[in-house]
């Protein structure tokens, strides 16, 4: 079935592609026939604006006004769009409003800020604190881009003055970084080399120097910029002559030969160089998380909003793009206000789109991490999230709550942790506290100073000290159960009021009694009372709310999830590892709410940011059903491998925690078709595991981390991996590992197929991450961004198209190649294409099950205007599979289990999409419905 020729505002299904210089718009265009054949309506791509040269992801934007030339530029984008439209498809793009890449030598806006300081035309575009408490940074930007202490860089001649003839700019060079010199210093630098004896050259240089010297007396900003442009043009002309360039080179060389003079020059600039480790303590501008090469943007300012979105608005107006996914919306000052403004601007452009591309309401989803029991806000005027909440829901559904206690105790016993650390919350709180104080100390200081300024306005808070505020604020942030609150000048809503109330309650015991009353004050200052037009209150609110989000992200996703290893399939972006499982009733309730509130939100099970591929998680979920099987394998492995655990002064390498998580990762990520005797295949797998482990160890921040890596520990852990997989231990370990995987892999595949079918059939817009149409055993980036073998996928898809009506059951004989997953996905998406209204606007009806296997399946119907779809998937079915070598249930496994259909379906024939059966009756026997294949999709 083909996609409709006319565009629709809401995609039927999306496919995410990661674009970079080795995979461009033209590469994507070459895949469109296969993407369309798979049943995808919209291509969904990583950011397309100009990023740092060589960027592999596009989130490090340096110019939001231009299509990335490394992707082929606007011309290649136009070819892709034309090819999409010819197939009745559309384009969704990822946008990055929160930040831009800085450092290096390519961001013109940032370089202008460094050159001109607060007087820069772009100074207000970045969230810079120009008057921080540190006097050394007044009117300056901290530039923490050095890989060594400042004095070592200066004395080692790694900091040198450099003239760029193309830009007519003098700048300090440090490797690939450029730090522009203020124009007011040009005259002194140019005259610093003395005279040459060549009258004309000396006169020309003096004339150029005079132009720059005159800038100091020009006060009007517009006039100053015009004079600066003229002076730079004069310098460019002067440098174009051999004599002129020689004079400039001489002046530059003179300064480079005098470190003290060079230091004095740098001290006068609007930037202050520092070692990159200084950023966490002293940075005076907002970063993306704790990444010093990504600077926060002030898109809450109307002119910055327009400047950073001009390209997106134009592409939407042209009909080239049909919607957006907003990256890191929680980083913004006012996420709700931003989303509403974006909706209004795109809607205004819709009337100017080509007549055949008008959508009325563009599709907008946000990357928003929702905490447990945190609903998505309904007042943002978006279509929903980008799908991490669904990934969490479906992932938890696949887990069997019965295994939680056994796995929890096993984790404690293995690691020697106390019972107090049994729950993930303890690990998360410890990580939050460390991340806040070690990685966001500067941001915590800034928020505390902003709140202190508010306190000084109030007579009854006259004696509240900055240090007391800092202590109380830190505990409030640590105990906040969500990423952030969304108070504005009018105060906070009931949802946030409850969140802050709980955070205050939880924080109280961690403060001295004398500081405890401050928590209530902070609650009032941070949105509990309307800030109105009070700028100090508004600043304090902004600093506080923009602090908690990156702390939560780095502490939970990027620290605690690498420390707490009970069952790694629950350690995922958007998930709470402490919430082990979700029962069928709760899942149905969540899907009914999704149908009611968010019918057009994105549904994801794999992304460019996931920790583990969707089928790794699906396989590991089987361990919740078979914890004894896991321990029967892991405990002997630990004993057998004790000889290769190295003893270092700080303790064992790897630690018990790391060893447990390594074994789970090996079991989960072992490629389905890999033979343990395939030396090359196993070595390639070992390289991937070692890469994962290196990142996991540093993210955990226990024995090593990114700030101060312990290379001896890392090397010992690296050696341990290769000893197990390719070294002395391999001959015994590999067959044992393969046997362990073999016993749970069929059940894992059933979970994977169930997860896929749920994604395609529940309310929302299913997204397919690149390559995940076959088994996805990827790990955290960069592993999940490896090149995809699209040729293999092309061949299997064409073979499927050659037999469109055949049962897919024969594919189970070779299930490890993943063709069964791709075929089921394509068939399911074809039903979405044939019955779009059922999925876009249809009711969600849970269907009851009865019989001995009723607890091991989930079924529901979607209905619209008398058209019906029924989906049936198994749950926790390892016991039903028994010792089956394929993901198919043995005869008699389901015994008397049936699904009860709604009355309108009782006499209506239903076509089984995957095996071609025609079924009819008030009850469907799962022994028949799931007799040939492990999941079923039926339609009227």
Model-found features: residue ranges?
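Carbohydrate-interacting/catalytic domains
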Residues: 1-53, 65, 70, 78, ...
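Activation on extended, non-transmembrane soluble regions of large proteins
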Residues: 33, 45, 89, 121-125, ...
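Hydrophobic or amphipathic alpha-helical targeting/insertion segments
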Residues: 80-128
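Conserved short loop/turn motifs at secondary-structure junctions
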Residues: 98, 326-332, 813-814
């Amino acid at each position: 079935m083909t996609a409709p020729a006319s565009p629709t505002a809401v995609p039927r299904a999306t496919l995410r592609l990661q674009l970079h210089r080795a995979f461009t718009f033209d590469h994507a265009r070459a895949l469109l026939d296969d993407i369309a054949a798979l049943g995808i309506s919209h291509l969904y791509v990583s950011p397309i604006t100009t990023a740092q040269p060589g960027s592999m992801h596009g989130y490090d934007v340096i110019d939001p006004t231009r299509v990335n030339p490394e992707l082929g530029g606007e011309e290649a984008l136009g070819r892709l769009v034309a090819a999409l439209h010819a197939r009745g498809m559309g384009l969704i793009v990822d946008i990055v409003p929160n930040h831009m890449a800085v450092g290096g030598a390519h961001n013109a806006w940032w370089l202008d800020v460094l050159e001109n300081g607060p007087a820069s035309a772009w100074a207000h575009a970045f969230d810079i604190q120009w008057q921080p408490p540190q006097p050394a940074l007044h009117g300056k930007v901290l530039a923490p881009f050095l890989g060594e202490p400042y004095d070592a860089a200066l004395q080692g001649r790694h900091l040198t003055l450099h003239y760029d003839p193309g830009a007519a700019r003098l700048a300090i060079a440090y490797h690939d970084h450029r730090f522009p010199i203020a124009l007011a210093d040009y005259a002194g630098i140019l005259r610093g080399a003395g005279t040459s004896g060549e009258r004309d050259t000396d006169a020309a240089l003096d004339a150029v120097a005079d132009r720059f010297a005159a800038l100091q007396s020009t006060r009007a900003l517009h006039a100053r910029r015009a004079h600066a442009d003229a002076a730079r043009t004069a310098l460019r002309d002067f440098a174009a002559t051999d004599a002129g360039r020689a004079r400039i080179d001489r002046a530059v060389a003179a300064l480079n030969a005098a470190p003290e003079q060079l230091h004095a020059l740098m001290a006068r600039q609007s930037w202050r160089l520092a070692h990159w480790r200084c950023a966490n303590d002293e940075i005076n501008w907002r970063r993306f998380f704790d990444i010093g090469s990504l600077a926060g943007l002030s898109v809450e300012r109307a002119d910055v909003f327009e400047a950073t979105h001009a390209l997106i608005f134009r592409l939407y107006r042209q009909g080239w793009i049909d919607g957006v996914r907003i990256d890191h919306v929680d980083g913004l000052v006012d996420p709700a206000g931003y989303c509403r403004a974006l909706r209004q601007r795109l809607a205004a452009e819709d009337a100017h789109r080509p007549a055949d591309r008008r959508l009325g309401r563009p599709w907008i989803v946000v990357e928003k991490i929702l905490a447990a029991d945190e609903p998505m806000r309904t007042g943002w005027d978006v279509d929903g999230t980008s799908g991490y909440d669904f990934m969490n829901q479906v992932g938890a559904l696949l887990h069997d709550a019965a295994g939680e206690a056994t796995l929890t105790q096993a984790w404690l016993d293995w690691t020697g942790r106390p019972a107090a650390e049994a729950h993930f919350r303890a690990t998360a709180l410890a990580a939050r506290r460390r991340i806040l104080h070690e990685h966001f100390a500067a941001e915590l200081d800034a928020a505390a100073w902003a709140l202190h300024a508010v306190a000084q306005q109030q007579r009854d808070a006259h004696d509240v000290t900055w240090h007391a505020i800092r202590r109380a604020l830190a505990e409030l942030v640590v105990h906040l159960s969500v990423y952030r609150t969304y108070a504005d000048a009018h105060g906070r809503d009931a949802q946030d009021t409850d969140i802050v109330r709980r955070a205050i309650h939880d924080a109280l015991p961690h403060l001295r009694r004398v500081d405890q009353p401050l928590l209530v004050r902070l609650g009032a200052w941070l949105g509990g009372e309307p800030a109105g037009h009070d700028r100090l209150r508004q600043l304090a609110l902004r600093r506080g709310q923009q602090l908690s989000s990156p702390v939560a992200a780095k502490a939970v996703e990027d620290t605690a999830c690498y420390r707490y290893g009970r069952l790694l399939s629950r350690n995922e972006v958007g998930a709470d590892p402490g919430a082990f499982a979700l029962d069928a009733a709760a899942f149905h309730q969540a899907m009914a709410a999704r149908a009611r509130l968010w019918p057009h939100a994105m549904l994801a099970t794999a992304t460019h940011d996931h920790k583990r591929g969707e089928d790794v998680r699906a396989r590991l979920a089987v361990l919740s059903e078979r914890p004894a099987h896991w321990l029967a394998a892991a405990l002997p492995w630990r004993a057998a491998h004790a000889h290769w655990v190295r003893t270092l002064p700080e303790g064992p390498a790897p630690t018990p925690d790391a060893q447990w998580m390594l074994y789970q990762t090996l079991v989960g990520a072992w490629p389905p078709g890999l033979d343990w005797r395939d030396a090359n295949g196993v070595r390639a797998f070992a390289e991937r595991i070692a890469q994962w482990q290196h990142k996991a160890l540093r993210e955990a921040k226990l024995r090593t981390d990114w700030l101060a890596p312990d290379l001896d520990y890392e090397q010992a852990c690296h050696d341990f991996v290769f000893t197990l997989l390719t070294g002395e231990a391999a001959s015994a370990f590999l067959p044992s590992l393969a046997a362990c995987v073999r016993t749970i892999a069929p059940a894992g595949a059933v979970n994977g197929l169930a997860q896929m079918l749920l994604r395609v059939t529940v309310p929302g817009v299913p997204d397919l991450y690149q390559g995940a149409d076959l088994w996805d055993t990827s790990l955290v980036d960069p592993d999940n961004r490896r090149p995809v073998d699209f040729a293999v996928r092309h061949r299997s898809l064409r073979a499927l198209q050659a037999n469109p009506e055949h049962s897919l059951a024969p594919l189970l004989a070779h299930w490890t190649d993943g063709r069964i997953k791709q075929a089921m996905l394509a068939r399911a998406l074809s039903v979405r294409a044939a019955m779009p209204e059922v999925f876009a606007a249809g009711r969600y009806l849970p269907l009851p099950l009865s019989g001995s296997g009723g607890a091991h399946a989930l079924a529901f119907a979607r209905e619209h205007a008398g058209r019906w779809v029924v989906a049936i998937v198994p749950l926790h079915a390892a016991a039903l599979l028994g010792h089956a070598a394929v993901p198919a249930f043995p005869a008699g496994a389901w015994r008397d289990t049936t699904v009860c259909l709604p009355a309108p379906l009782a006499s209506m024939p239903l076509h089984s999409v995957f095996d071609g059966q025609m079924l009819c009756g008030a009850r469907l026997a799962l022994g028949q419905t799931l007799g040939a294949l492990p999941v079923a999709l039926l339609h009227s």
